[in-house]
Amino acid sequence: MKALVKRLFAMAGLGVYRVGASQNNNSHTPVVTSPIHHNSKEGLEAFYSNREAVESYLDPAFYERIIDLGLTFGVGYDEKRIADIGCGTGGLLKALKNRFRPRSLTGFEYSEKAIDIARSQVPDVEFCYFDIYEGSVRQFDVIFCVEVLEHLLHPDTALRNVIGMLADSGTVLVTVPNGRIDTFDGHINFWSPESWNVFLKNVCADLSVKTGLMEDGQNNYAVITKSESLVTAN
């Protein structure tokens, strides 16, 4: 019945989404007075120093859905060089390690406190300090950039740098919150599904890009492949 209702609304050009809880409903969510400061180096270190806030933020089920999204689009993980840009405390890489046999797993993160936590929780994975605006010459077959771009003043530059780390025929899986229902004051960018597609077409004009909403409607996604000169939206 839910699927039928969603299809009927979609035919009318409308979407049905579950609205996420306000940040104020979670006692462990940090109070944000300035999104710029919240996303600064100082703000990130403060966040990752708050154990309760970090534990409240983590969602292992979400990591599994991200991994499954890649599988849906034919992305393989076994014997692949995999990177997670903005890896936080390493939860996504830990999930990949438990399910697959990648050639290598590398986490890139701007917060040194987050890296310390990640190294303690997933000791056999490589974690590196990383400034997304500087990029890297290292190459990977699969790159995740999950819930990162909404925190950045220059997401276009950041995404181009991430794509620049792809090996030939490599794939980037990106997610950002659905800006129509995102209520977190710590975010700088808010993309509706439509504006998300416009943003991607401007940044990825020469790449294959498949976009959509994740099943619960909470997040926009993009599966970007370094191969065809094609941009399609699902």
Language-model region placement:
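Conserved N-terminal segment of class I S-adenosyl-L-methionine
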Residues: 1-138, 142, 146, 157-159, ...
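A short acidic, helix-capping loop that chelates divalent metal ions and anchors anionic groups
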Residues: 180-186
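Residues lining the SAM
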Residues: 146-149, 175
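Conserved beta-strand signature within the Rossmann-like core of class I S-adenosyl-L-methionine
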Residues: 170-177
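A short glycine-rich, Lys/Arg-flanked "PGG" loop and its adjoining helix->strand segment in the class I
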Residues: 157-168
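Structured helix-beta-strand junction loops
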Residues: 168-169, 203
